[in-house]
Structures are given as structure tokens and as C-alpha cells.
Curated annotation (Swiss-Prot):
CDD domains the record matches: serpinN_SPI-1_SPI-2 (cd19583)
Site positions per UniProt: Reactive bond: 322-323
Name of the protein in its database record: Serine proteinase inhibitor 1
Cellular localization per UniProt: Host cytoplasm
Annotated source species: Rabbitpox virus (strain Utrecht)
Main function: This viral protein may be involved in the regulation of the complement cascade. Involved in red pock formation.
Amino acid sequence: MDIFKELILKHPDENVLISPVSILSTLSILNHGAAGSTAEQLSKYIENVNENTPDDKKDDNNDMDVDIPYCATLATANKIYCSDSIEFHASFLQKIKDGFQTVNFNNANQTKELINEWVKTMTNGKINSLLTSPLSINTRMTVVSAVHFKAMWKYPFSKHLTYTDKFYISKNIVTSVDMMVSTENDLQYVHINELFGGFSIIDIPYEGNSSMVIILPDDIEGIYNIEKNITDEKFKKWCGMLSTKSIDLYMPKFKVEMTEPYNLVPILENLGLTNIFGYYADFSKMCNETITVEKFLHTTFIDVNEEYTEASAVTGVFMTNFSMVYRTKVYINHPFMYMIKDNTGRILFIGKYCYPQ
């Protein structure tokens, strides 16, 4: 949640989407090779994240793969591209298993295309590239984590009911969206009044064991108050208040595609991970060379339609030297927050939708 909150501060009027699973996986890979204060900071951050993660989903930092057996439609993959001149310690190579490939970073364009092709393959063609420009010839290692999620709705929206409706970007700005309709479904729902405003939470299930949770403020511009006040603890508390209600749901079709990846370096530094960058970086359990994290890139994609949701994310580290008597109607027609989670509560993707593309 913390990285997401930092990002929405930097992009207040934009659609934001990240995959905590992908980011944590990449940080865990780095922790395999970290020592000293670098290892202390990474371990502390991962431990703090794990405090808000179900016990059977915690990253124990002993496996490079993020295994989520309850969500068969989620595929994760990790890859390390390193200079063919670096000799890695056997203990590090043993921990990262097979996700390892040597490349010649002097051939920057070829290496860029190699990495982008892997990203495209691992995300089922939904993210065509992580790198938009060639890597520096000084790059010594690149750590890439890809996540691809696709799930059919348990209660599909009827295509013939989809219609054009208004979406309020703000009180003064209105646009049009394709509004999907699903009626008379028993869904988990709650309306909550907090000091900062009222909002609704609705849990929309997929086939299998995952769901999308929507947090919809009562006020058209109420998303900003939710952004400021939401925490992992509050989100868990709110979800614990959900109960089954018969719902008529009106929800926009939406797609979010990023034109440029997020560079998470300043955000990670703000969150206390200062010693994975620059002079104080210590990755001596990885190799004997003095290497540091130069870039930490994260890019995402999501497509929500009548039949399914498909989402992907890629994180790259570049190292250089949501039976009643009545039905509740929920109209999602202004900015909202959403999460895709598995049935243990682990958040796979978290986003804010405020501007139809």
C-alpha cells in the first residue's frame, strides 16, 4: 500500500496501477545477494510488508518465484540478465534457480530487444516493452519480474446491456464510458461512513478464488480523501465488514496502459531503502564486484470488460557499477480505487481509475 500511496501523490489526476507481488518479488531477489546495511533495509521492508500478508503467502525470501496456488490464472516469472563478465557466487545462483541469463551489455540494442521480448512473452503480449531506450553500456545486471493475470467473472456482465453513460472525472468535467450492467447478483458489499467521508466497498468475484474489490466514494471527488487515509490495516477492517447483498452493479469497462514505466527509485528511497542505491549499496553476497541499483522500473496493464479481467505487470531493476428484501444499486460513475486479490486477501494488483483513456 505504501508504494501505491506514494505514486498517487506524484500522479494525483492520473490512472495509477501497480502490482505489489511483482515489486516484492524483485526486492526479494535483490535481498538474496545483499549484505550489511543493504540487507538490513531490504529485510526490514520485506518483513513490514509480510506483516500485512496472510501467513501462507508470505515471501520467505528463500524462493525467487511467487507461488499463488489459489489463483490458477496468475502466472509469475523472474529473470536476471547479467554481464557475461561477472562471476556470481554459487550460493546466490542456487537461490535464484534457473532465472538467469548472461548477456553482452555492450550490445545495448540487442540486449534491450532480448529483455523486451521476454517481457512480451511473459505478459501474453499485453506489455510489449519495459525498456524504451537502450541500456547503458555500464549496466552490469538487470532483474526483471513479470506478472500476468487473467480471470473470468463469476457473474459475467451481459454485453447486450452495456450502454454509453456519463463518467464524472470531477464535479466540473464529464466524459462518456461504456457502462457494463450485472443485476440481481449476491455480492459482498458494505457502505461505510468515516470522518473523511462515506464510501462503498464491493467485492466482485472471479471464477476460482480471486476477486476485484472496488472502493467507491460517495462524493464525486472523494477519492482524494480515501487515498490519504487508507492503510493496510483499515482496508482489512473494512473488508471484514462486508456482507452479502443483492446488487445491481453498473461498472465501466476500462483499460489502463502505461506509455512509460514508473521509476520507483525516489519512492523506495522515501520508504527507507536508501542503501540499495549509490555508494552504500552492498551486494557482496551476489558477486565480488561493487554494483548498485541504478534504475527500478515498474510497468502495468489492465483490461476490464464484460467477460474477464486481464492484468499484467513488469518490474525491472537495472544495476550498474472490493437474500435481501431489496436490491442495492451501485453506480461506479466517478473515480474509484480497486484491488485484485486472491482468497487469502493478498493484493495482486492495486489501482486508481479516474480518467477514461
